[in-house]
């Protein structure tokens, strides 16, 4: 019996894959649990439509990430902080950087996608990687300066 997988299953395959399974396994396990649907003509057409829509969404996200890359790689984000000689009081986190970018330039980014291994604790210039899309890494220049 041919079924279309709705969830990734270790021994069968990934989401959207059409696999051939024994009728009892499909009837008693896969179908009742919502892990698969029968591979009928209408379900196959729906799957193809869903794959096309997903590909279109991914292309749109990539194009949006490319536009964001052009903007972000040409600017330096300045973050004023209270500081001593070189050490700052507290630290600058990915969330602080995202808020400063939103406040200064009106650009909203997801702080979770900003590669910052540990919070910044010293004044200086930093180059961070932001990944809005797996194929589009963005180099963001951040300058942490003492507040006057």
From Swiss-Prot:
One GO MF term: rRNA binding
Keyword rRNA-binding: yes
Sorted UniProt keywords: Ribonucleoprotein, Ribosomal protein, RNA-binding, rRNA-binding
GO CC terms: ribonucleoprotein complex; ribosome
SUPFAM superfamilies in the cross-refs: L9 N-domain-like, Ribosomal protein L9 C-domain
Protein family: Belongs to the bacterial ribosomal protein bL9 family.
HAMAP family xrefs: Ribosomal_bL9 (MF_00503)
UniProt protein name: Large ribosomal subunit protein bL9
Organism, scientific name: Thermus thermophilus (strain ATCC BAA-163 / DSM 7039 / HB27)
């Amino acid at each position: 019996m041919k079924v279309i997988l709705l969830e990734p299953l270790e021994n069968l395959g990934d989401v959207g894959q059409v696999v051939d399974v024994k009728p009892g396994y499909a009837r008693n396990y896969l179908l009742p649990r919502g892990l698969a649907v029968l591979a009928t003509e209408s379900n196959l057409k729906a799957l193809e439509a869903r794959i096309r829509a997903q590909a279109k969404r991914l292309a749109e996200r990539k194009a949006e990430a490319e536009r964001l890359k052009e903007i972000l790689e040409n600017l330096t984000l300045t973050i004023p902080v209270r500081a001593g000689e070189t050490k700052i009081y507290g630290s600058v986190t990915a969330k602080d950087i995202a808020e400063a970018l939103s406040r200064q330039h009106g650009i909203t980014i997801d702080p979770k996608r900003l590669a910052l291994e540990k919070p910044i604790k010293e004044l200086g210039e930093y180059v961070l990687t932001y990944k809005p899309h797996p194929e589009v890494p963005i180099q963001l220049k951040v300058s942490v300066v003492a507040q006057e």
